[in-house]
Regions:
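A cross-family signal for N-terminal binding/gating loops and helix N-caps
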Residues: 1-206, 213-217
Length: 217
């Protein structure tokens, strides 16, 4: 039985969503991140790769890097670029490229499920990278990067998601330079939130996976 809960996301205002959207922190090197950051002051890489805003050559694990990540995140919130939802929600996230669509739902998985085996691990990870992300999350007091989990969706959950998409307008709908269109819907009705939670409670296991042909959570 999987625990998957709604939460209050800290997310970009609609008119800045395309600017805030950024590549994962570990697919760009220091120079690439710096170039993106210099060209776009709203890029979330200022939080994920904050060394771009410090002196060249600083050690990636220097305490000042983590402090800068928190400062940059707080500054984006202070300026109203990022705003937190007032109630806990689920978020439908859709990616479209060259006619192919991949749809998932964003929520909070349980660390206890990771420990008790409900979340299935796919590979060994490097301890230095783990400690870096733990320190980053602790410093920002925020989960700054998504974890992808794959599962076999119950038909009722798929139906619920499709009905929500067709009856509600996406809060974000933009296409990036890589020709990938991003769309997000916010599920904010208590009865529907309860139904989503119950559907996940009937799922035996989730698979931790950075990439998968399956639908992603």
């Amino acid at each position: 039985m999987a625990v998957f809960r709604a939460f209050q996301a800290l997310r970009p205002i609609q008119e800045k969503a395309a600017d805030v959207a950024a590549l994962p922190y570990d697919v760009v090197n220091r120079e690439e991140a710096k170039k993106i950051g210099d060209e776009n002051p709203f890029s979330f890489l200022h939080v994920d790769r904050p060394e771009m805003d410090l002196e060249p050559g600083i050690d990636l694990y220097d305490e000042r890097v983590y402090k800068k990540a928190r400062e940059n995140l707080m500054e984006m919130e202070k300026k109203g670029i990022l705003v937190q939802d007032k109630t806990s929600c689920y978020y439908i996230y859709e990616l479209v490229r060259k006619g192919k669509t991949q749809t998932g739902i964003v929520g909070c998985a349980s660390i206890d499920d990771y420990r008790n085996g409900v979340v299935k691990k796919h590979e060994l990870t490097r301890e230095d990278k783990e400690q870096d992300r733990i320190h980053h999350v602790d410093s920002c007091n925020a989960n700054t990067g998504p974890i992808f989990l794959a599962c076999r969706y119950p038909e009722n959950l798929l139906k619920l998601m499709n009905e929500w998409k067709t009856s509600h307008k996406a809060v974000y709908d933009f296409t990036e330079e890589d020709e990938i269109t991003h769309r997000v819907w916010v599920i904010d009705e208590p009865a529907v939130i309860f139904s989503v939670k119950e559907e996940f409670a009937g799922i035996d296991s989730l698979i931790l996976s950075p990439s998968s042909p399956s639908r992603l959570i």
